[in-house]
């Protein structure tokens, strides 16, 4: 077919022009009208989001696990660590200053460290290279000191928080001393609070008797509860080294500030509209008034509770053997070591002289009465089994008087192995770990509650009056309460505080007083004011 030469020439010119425009547009993608789809493969930046993490992980693996490219050897207690100046300097200002200074360590191939143990330095290496470290209670204070010295700030702060959460009677003075040396105000405050609220337990310990003067002054000037006998503690500290410390006597007595305790009594119970338990803390004033100073929610099915050294301990929940402590310094709930076995309706009793909590009797999950006795060493966070009770009981009242636990009433087995209300008094001596049953019985039986005042045990039971039990004379004295209470039987609870006996009603009608205060010296009964607790089922009252 013949092609028109003029048409062919025009078509070639058009094609040539279109090709030149296309090439020009590809060379100049910034010009208006350029297509993003056409420029996608011409100008594209790829960013690997996992690159930095992969490089860091790979580098640490090469450096630590395969021990490649090590350029410094750190010797600690004879063990040599093959490490890297760059990694150490990146994480620690201490090592950065060491390696960039004119000191001999900047050029030596082997560096010996004298102020750290081998096991703790291994933990520091793990932290520096991997960012993780397993903190153990037995090494925590050394890790705290060394991390501050080597300027590992994040690790130091975490150790400080850990120590503040775990400070207790057994280590509070040591932790306070430690925090003072390292200028750590948060940890110092937590340790000081523990020390001043447990001063009576600490005053004869080696740590207290060797306490520096400025730390003792800071403790007693911060407000010590009257119940901790701060004057006796001051005298004990002075008499330990009277020749040198007599000069501080007047200044210490002037600095002393005694206060009432913020939390005198804990009520544990339930509201009618709730299924879980509540712990309500009460402040008892000298004008016969009681005010609510706090409230904490607890788990379901609290089976036992006690107050030890100002802290609240409760056992129970979905797993009956679990135990928690409400730290009075931080108002946080902390897990404690669980009981060896699940137990229900057992009795928890605080024994401050041994810094221990005893669990006595109770029921197994198979509803069998138990005569087991175990005790929890607060300082060691460990439960230990000891001598059993003479008679298996559950739901008994417990009171500690001079190291002897009086277990009162509850339920015991009858001759047919059915349970019956008990009138027994069992005495467990925490010094000898021996138990015996009194040859006489209580004037009433069943579930009751008890509190110690001086050398007496005050007992209340369902639908009965208040009874004063004198273990030395083996006698009981019945004390009558107002007729309005006696006419409406209910399960009462009792607490001893500030030289007075407080009696709480479990249920009360609208308008009735729910708390009475008894003066044991005069037998005078007064109605307390200012409290309206909505708990309809008082499980425990702890003072």
From Swiss-Prot:
SUPFAM superfamilies assigned: Kelch motif, POZ domain
Annotated BTB domain residues: 70-137
Keyword Repeat: yes
Domain (BACK): residue spans on this chain: 172-264
Keyword entries, A-Z: Kelch repeat, Repeat
Chain positions of Kelch repeats: 264-310, 311-353, 356-403, 405-455, 457-505
InterPro entries, per the entry: BACK, BTB-kelch_protein, BTB/POZ_dom, KBTBD4, KBTBD4_BACK, KBTBD4_BTB_POZ, Kelch-typ_b-propeller, Kelch_2
Subunit composition and interactions: Component of the BCR(KBTBD4) E3 ubiquitin ligase complex, at least composed of CUL3, KBTBD4 and RBX1.
Function summary: Substrate-specific adapter of a BCR (BTB-CUL3-RBX1) E3 ubiquitin ligase complex which targets CoREST corepressor complex components RCOR1, KDM1A/LSD1 and HDAC2 for proteasomal degradation. RCOR1 is likely to be the primary target while degradation of KDM1A and HDAC2 is likely due to their association with RCOR1. Also targets RCOR3, MIER2 and MIER3 for proteasomal degradation as well as associated proteins ZNF217 and RREB1. Degradation is dependent on the presence of an ELM2 domain in the target proteins.
Protein name, as recorded: Kelch repeat and BTB domain-containing protein 4
Organism: Macaca fascicularis
Lineage of source species: Eukaryota, Metazoa, Chordata, Craniata, Vertebrata
Gene: KBTBD4
């Amino acid at each position: 077919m013949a092609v028109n030469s003029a048409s062919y020439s025009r078509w070639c010119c058009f094609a040539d022009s279109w090709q030149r425009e296309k090439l020009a547009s590809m060379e100049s993608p910034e010009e208006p009208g350029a297509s993003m789809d056409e420029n996608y493969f011409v100008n594209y930046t790829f960013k690997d989001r996992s690159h930095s993490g992969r490089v860091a992980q790979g580098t640490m693996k090469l450096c630590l696990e395969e021990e490649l490219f090590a350029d410094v050897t750190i010797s600690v207690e004879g063990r040599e660590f093959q490490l890297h100046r760059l990694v150490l300097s990146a994480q620690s200002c201490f090592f950065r200053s060491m390696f960039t200074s004119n000191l001999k360590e900047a050029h030596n191939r082997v560096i010996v460290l004298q102020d750290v143990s081998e096991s703790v330095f291994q933990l520091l290496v793990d932290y520096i290279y991997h960012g993780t470290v397993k903190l153990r209670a037995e090494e925590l204070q050394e890790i705290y000191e060394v991390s501050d010295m080597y300027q590992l700030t994040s690790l130091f702060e975490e150790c400080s928080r850990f120590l503040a959460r775990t400070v207790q009677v057994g280590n509070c003075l040591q932790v306070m001393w430690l925090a003072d040396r390292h200028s750590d105000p948060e940890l110092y405050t937590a340790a000081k609070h523990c020390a001043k609220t447990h001063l009576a337990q600490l005053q004869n310990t080696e740590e207290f008797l060797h306490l520096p003067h400025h730390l003792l002054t800071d403790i007693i000037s911060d407000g010590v509860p009257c119940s901790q006998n701060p004057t006796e503690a001051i005298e004990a500290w002075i008499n330990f080294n009277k020749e040198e410390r007599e000069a501080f006597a007047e200044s210490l007595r002037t600095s002393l500030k005694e206060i009432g305790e913020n939390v005198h009594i804990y009520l544990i119970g339930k509201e009618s509209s709730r299924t879980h338990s509540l712990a309500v803390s009460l402040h008892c004033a000298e004008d016969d008034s009681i005010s609510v100073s706090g409230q904490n929610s607890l788990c379901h099915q609290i089976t036992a509770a006690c107050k030890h050294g100002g802290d609240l301990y409760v056992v129970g929940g979905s797993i009956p053997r679990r135990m928690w402590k409400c730290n009075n310094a931080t108002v946080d709930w902390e897990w404690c070591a669980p009981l060896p076995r699940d137990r229900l309706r057992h009795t928890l009793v605080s024994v401050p002289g041994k810094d221990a909590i005893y669990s006595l009797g109770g029921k197994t999950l198979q509803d069998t009465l138990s005569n087991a006795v175990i005790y929890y060493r607060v300082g060691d966070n460990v439960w230990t089994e000891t001598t059993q009770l003479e008679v298996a009981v559950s739901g008994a009242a417990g009171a500690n008087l001079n190291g002897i636990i009086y277990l009162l009433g509850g339920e015991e087995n009858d001759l047919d192995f059915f349970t019956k209300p008990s009138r027994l008094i069992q005495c467990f001596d925490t010094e000898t770990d021996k138990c015996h049953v009194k040859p006489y019985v209580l004037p009433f039986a069943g579930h009751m509650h008890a509190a110690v005042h001086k050398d007496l045990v005050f007992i209340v039971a369902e639908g009965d009056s208040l009874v004063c039990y004198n273990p030395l004379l083996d006698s009981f004295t019945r004390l009558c309460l107002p007729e309005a209470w006696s006419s409406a039987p209910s399960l009462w609870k009792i607490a001893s505080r500030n030289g007075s006996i407080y009696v709480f009603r479990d249920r009360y009608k609208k308008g009735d007083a729910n708390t009475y205060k008894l003066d044991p010296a005069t037998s005078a009964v007064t109605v307390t004011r200012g409290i309206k607790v909505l708990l309809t089922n008082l499980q425990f009252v702890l003072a």
